[in-house]
């Protein structure tokens, strides 16, 4: 329930911007929004969908730890960026500019739909993370 509340809060924040989907790559933020404890994952969170992208080593863990998420399993040679963003039908994706490397951002742009716009939304995520649950404070 705690994770669903956080997702809903993020969705509310996104609705006040021109960003329709959040791309989350920082491990701490992935855990904050999903509970996922594996070492390789990305999240895509839109108004209606929550997708966790991970490889076959963590598929079962993702199913167990992230029941509110659709699982997108990475496969060799798969254009996961385009395929997963097409599932959400995004126009503008917010990314954590303070964590996404220049090279990763270029890959995201090159491998996604050409009409897709990528925008830094680090400030919004930082504000979201200020909110702490009782469990986090302990």
Locate each region found by the language model:
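N-terminal accessory/capping or targeting/presequence segment of soluble
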Residues: 1-86, 132-138
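Flexible, acidic/His-enriched mid-domain "rim/lid" segments that flank
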Residues: 2, 7, 48, 79-138
């Amino acid at each position: 329930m705690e994770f669903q509340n956080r997702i809903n809060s993020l969705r509310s924040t996104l609705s006040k911007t021109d960003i329709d989907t959040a791309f989350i790559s920082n491990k701490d933020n992935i855990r904050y929004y999903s509970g996922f404890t594996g070492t390789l994952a990305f999240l895509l969170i839109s108004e209606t969908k929550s997708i966790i992208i991970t490889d076959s080593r963590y598929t079962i863990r993702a199913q167990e730890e992230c029941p509110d998420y659709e699982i997108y399993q990475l496969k060799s040679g798969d254009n996961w960026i385009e395929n997963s963003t097409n599932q959400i039908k995004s126009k503008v994706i917010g990314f954590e500019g303070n964590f996404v490397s220049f090279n990763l951002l270029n890959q995201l742009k090159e491998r996604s739909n050409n009409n897709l716009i990528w925008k830094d939304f680090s400030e919004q995520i930082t504000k979201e993370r200020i909110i702490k649950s009782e469990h986090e404070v302990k």
